[in-house]
Amino acid sequence: MPSFDFDIPRRSPQEIAKGMVAIPGGTFRMGGEDPDAFPEDGEGPVRTVRLSPFLIDRYAVSNRQFAAFVKATGYVTDAERYGWSFVFHAHVAPGTPVMDAVVPEAPWWVAVPGAYWKAPEGPGSSITDRPNHPVVHVSWNDAVAYATWAGKRLPTEAEWEMAARGGLDQARYPWGNELTPRGRHRCNIWQGTFPVHDTGEDGYTGTAPVNAFAPNGYGLYNVAGNVWEWCADWWSADWHATESPATRIDPRGPETGTARVTKGGSFLCHESYCNRYRVAARTCNTPDSSAAHTGFRCAADPL
């Protein structure tokens, strides 16, 4: 775990629990065997997992909340230290300097010098008009720093998935099996032709406020689409396939790894390319990586 050079304030249980949802302990069926899944992601097998009770944020951490953390601690994010972060190509203002660094399998990502949480599209951009949008350009390290300061932690992948399911058993999405029940959009994802034209039929072509759309059965917002959310676990495509107490009772993932799990999908997910806005879907990134579609929410043990 990273170490931090800021003071961790003492917080009352009531202060920590504010804005969090209590998830009862018990069992649920984790993972999926969706034919549309990416085999290399290791969504399966479907397995029964038992979890202890926990708390989880109702919303993803917002720009306003992260700004309060930075103001209190002087924290500098990984994107700021590196001097750049990844921005979706259509969101980069004309004339903005860019770097040669590219992701060959995803050329729509542009490395933009000066892009960070407070200037998400690069120099000249601002979060002034989106204080209630999820903070982005935050690495796993940054998310752990915020959570530690807030008296919380990141959720395990199992906790995140149990909470995101909202009490439904093996539903495809946090609200059921239909993407747009009764023609209503329930999440912020890409509509149109990816990656050239987003029609914005769901109301957004970038991030949405953290309280947009209806919540799931547990009262959590935006656990599908909007921004990817960091989890505590190291990534593995097959660690969880082995039947053992470690993988079935309060699982915390492998002991070591090179990347951390992210869940939930983002506003850039589209069925033609990345359908990972399904609850069982998962992917990963290195702990120091950041991008314009990745944020987080926190968890905590019962207080």
Curated annotation (Swiss-Prot):
Pathway involvement of the protein, from the record: Protein modification; sulfatase oxidation
Stored SUPFAM superfamilies: C-type lectin-like
Source organism phylogeny: Bacteria, Bacillati, Actinomycetota, Actinomycetes, Streptosporangiales
Function, in words: Oxidase that catalyzes the conversion of cysteine to 3-oxoalanine on target proteins. 3-oxoalanine modification, which is also named formylglycine (fGly), occurs in the maturation of arylsulfatases and some alkaline phosphatases that use the hydrated form of 3-oxoalanine as a catalytic nucleophile.
Protein name: Formylglycine-generating enzyme
UniProt key word Protease: no
Cofactor: Cu(+)
Residue numbers binding Ca(2+) 1: 188-189, 202, 204
Annotated residues for binding of Ca(2+) 2: 222-223, 225, 227
